Amino acid sequence: MEQDKTLGEEIRQEEQQEQDIPAVTFDEFEIPSYEEWKEAVVALLKGKPFEKSMFTKTYEGITLNPIYRMEDLEGLTHNKTYPGMESNLRGANASGYIYKPWTIAQECDAKTPSEANEMVKYELLKGSTAASVVLDTATRKGYDVDTANKEEIADIGVSLSTLSDVNKLLDDVDLEKFEIDIYAGASNIALLSAVAVVCEQKKLSLKKLHGAITADPIGELALDGKLTRPLDEYYDEMAHSICWAEKFAPELKTVVVNTDVYHNGGANDIQEVAYAMNEAVTYMKSMERRGIDVNTFFFFFRFHFSIGANFFMEIATLRIVRLI
């Protein structure tokens, strides 16, 4: 008891000492002007040019200042926006991620349907909120294993050829609870059909199926330089996928502009955004010619942007996309 009392007194004394320490402030220091700061920096550079040493030119040709001041915000209007405002710069809903939390989608790139299924269930158990599966090149091109190039089978992800494969992939995965996230390549018709049949067999409601089973034919064309069929046929299938989703699976996205091919091909952020917007407009106009209005198209559409190591530029890219 005596030891406990002594220990308690020591703790109280330490807490009192912490309370007695005054808060650290910088009131004793005068705030330097920009000119004073620059003068100090020039002295430290020891003859090196200030503009060359302190300003950074990005891959996009944008010059970044060494520090930013309130004067740099003059004339800007988008910095006064909030979530839910008309620009959508900081999100379409005022409550942001509280309204809809960020989706956690750890990609599963196992080679067989059974292995991919185990990986998906493991990731969902760890906290993922989406069943995110990577398909191999053969499946993305629409080839079965018996006709595909051997090098493209199970090269970067799972190979799917039959309804049985899709059944194994989604076995014991609650698609009413978790999102599904699969990029199907140039066409998603075959995969959408298989998933719809699996849901029917498992007595799962397609109305509750949410997430994305998407196609990006122009992206695949940019990646390989060719498609297995005319581009207009893929546009027809894209229109069919939107009409089907609108009627049967209204919470499922079916069209994507995937910028991986441009980002990994060396495009800077400005070029990546330009290609993405051009591609999105092309899809939109193609769907309009097939009787799908703009609002319906964009309801079933999403962007997929690659994110590199330059945090400043990547955040700027995502913000400018929202503005556009």
Please give the residue ranges for each predicted region.
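Acidic/polar, glycine-rich intrinsically disordered N-terminal extensions of enzymes
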Residues: 1-176, 200
